[in-house]
Amino acid sequence: MYLDLDVILAELKADDWLASDVDLDAIEEPKTSVATGIELQYVMEDEWDRDRVVRAHQEIASKNIELVPLTSDALDAAADLRAQYTALNVFDGVHLGSAAVLDEPIISTDTLFPEIPEVEHLDPRDLE
């Protein structure tokens, strides 16, 4: 299952609003794109110290979340989705495109994702 950034943040931030609702053990073969490591650095740059920010991808991997490569196929899928759904930002497109190419559902609380039928969406709060 492909994890969006909100699920990653729930695992890495003790005070995250979603932390008590995410159970990585309930997620089969969790994975995310290396782009999530970049997005995590961008989002946490003002909150974490620099040493932690620059190694954000290592924190993801330390949670036994597989970091999958960002491929040109995933970028093509992202481009197709962003062309069709103008509300998708760059990272939304990359995450959905990666999940689509991997043929994995995306685990996210993003309220836009259920409107994208090309990729199965699961809310982490609904997993047991």
Tell me what each language-model feature is:
Residues 29-31, 63-64, 105:
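Short loop->beta-strand "edge-of-pocket" segments that line small-molecule binding or catalytic clefts
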Residues 1-32, 45-58:
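Short, well-structured N-terminal submotif of metal-dependent ribonuclease cores
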Residues 8-9, 37, 113-114:
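A generic structural signal for short hydrophobic patches within well-formed alpha-helices
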Residues 5, 72, 91-93:
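Conserved glycosyltransferase catalytic-site signature
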Residues 66-67, 96, 100-128:
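Acidic, PIN/NYN-like endoribonuclease modules and their adjacent C-terminal/linker elements
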Residues 64-84:
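Acidic catalytic patch
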